[in-house]
Amino acid sequence: MSEYFKYNPAVFAVDKYYQIMMPVEEQNLFFVKVGDKYYYDESNGIMRSRNEIHRVEVPMKALDEAMEYTVCIRPIIERKPYFTETEEVLEKTYKFYPVPENNIRAYHISDAHNLVAEPVKAAETFGDFDFLILNGDVIDHSGDPSKFINIYEICSLLMKGEKPSVFSRGNHDLRGNFAEKFADYTPNHLGNTYYSFRLGNIWGILLDCGEDKPDDHAEYGFTVACHVFRERQTEFLKKVIENKENEYEAEGVKHKLLIAHNTFTHRLPPPFDIEQEIFAEWIKLLKEEVKPEVMICGHLHELSVYYPDNTYWNTNGSICPVVVGGDVQKRDGAYFAGCGYIFNDGEIKVSFTDSCGKTLKEQII
């Protein structure tokens, strides 16, 4: 049985659902039991068996109330047009801990670039936490599907299938032969890598800036079309605002997070000074309508907090405090530093911790 449960499942918050996802090495059928109801990895009524990562979507309310779920795997002997041969179902039950109402602890990992042990150590330095934020470039590129396993290994080691995670795509994730299938290997909402989510009294929105240079940059070799992708997100953001009573103004929301791998309030030098009009519109809509408490970013490989009155930083415009919380070193010994968050009424505390067991800096924003 252990070969089928090599990794604990990852439980990702997407919209008003949890996507329970788990990598597998052999063909099998995958379903999850929550309470007395089964949820299946199926496509239009057909159980999937050939995918490398299974996905089952469960309503948040159901799993939060049940506080446990059972992963069910039925190994395939031979899948045939008639009388498919299978083995008996293997089951493993996991406890599940919904995000609490107060003193909510989260840890942010970005730009790990294929490191696993080091970001895990940095997170463990912060201590126990209630949910994990994976904010882009967890892998170094999407040229090899085996790299996606690193995402699930980090979730497995830190969350153990018992607590939720939030996932955002980074610019390096757009590179390589399997980048076009990235959403098949990671959480998404209707195929999109941008969406809102809810965890307890926390509401959040993920925006995906795509690549960090113009679409026609030679590095991409005509393989990206991020401008139209960003235009779609402008319309998505407007729809979120139109539906605000079911989104960031819904009953019970106390904290509003903006998560994006790229720091789009800060204009970098050419060729990284892209999409100034689109980003200006995002900033205006977010600042005037959504009003998030904090913008959680990576990309720059640094550990910093920038406030709205910092005109040097907010060259595209300001929304709220920006926390950049991911630093990595892969030469002369692997090293990683990330960022812990503690959310309380009227206060957010950030703690930068590293893989050497050090707390580098703490700050209340």
Write out the residue ranges for each language-model feature.
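Extended active-site neighborhood of metal-dependent phosphoesterases/phosphodiesterases
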Residues: 74-85, 91-92, 149-247, 281-282, ...
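An acidic-aromatic substrate-binding cleft motif
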Residues: 84-135, 140-141
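A general structural motif
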Residues: 103, 129, 162, 248-255, ...
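Acidic, histidine-bearing metal-coordination/catalytic regions of metal-dependent phosphoesterases
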Residues: 1-108, 354-365
